[in-house]
Amino acid sequence: SKAVLVASVAGYLLKDESNPDGVDASVFEGMKKDIRKDRFDFLQSFAKTFYGVGLVTSPVSQGVLDWSFVLGVMASPKATIDCVDAFAKTDFRPDFAAFTIPTLVIHGTGDKTVPIDPTGRAAANGIAGAKLIEYDGEPHGLFATVPDRLNQDLIEFLA
């Protein structure tokens, strides 16, 4: 058996005394405010950040953005808000000790959705013997931005 964490929230996202590299609570409160105001607009904007879409960069197709939007709107408004609290406030660090199998952590250094320091790097440091592969500049949705590289790394590790 082996485990792989890809752009995972494992670690702890919320900034507090025990997690100075975390994300300020105001960011998550802002997300919830935006969801309540206009969930559809939030989801469209969120997808662009998720995949690293900018003014001059578009690492995924409009189809991928549309697919992500459809997935998001299938969740209820309450579930969408609850999801923000779940990924922001759940501290997975105590679970690291339970990993007793070879573990690969893959995370993009350009991930603005789930920053690498309190998650990917924290997981790699907290899980005994874990291997960290950082994808330089890649966003959270690296499964869609660099699928060939991800698949190759998975095959090599899991073989």
List each model region and its residues.
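Conserved alpha/beta-hydrolase "acid-adjacent" motif
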Residues: K112-P118
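Catalytic active-site module of serine/aspartate enzymes centered on a nucleophile-bearing elbow/loop
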Residues: I127-A159
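Residue-level signal for the nucleotide or nucleotide-sugar donor/cofactor binding architecture
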Residues: A75, V114, T145
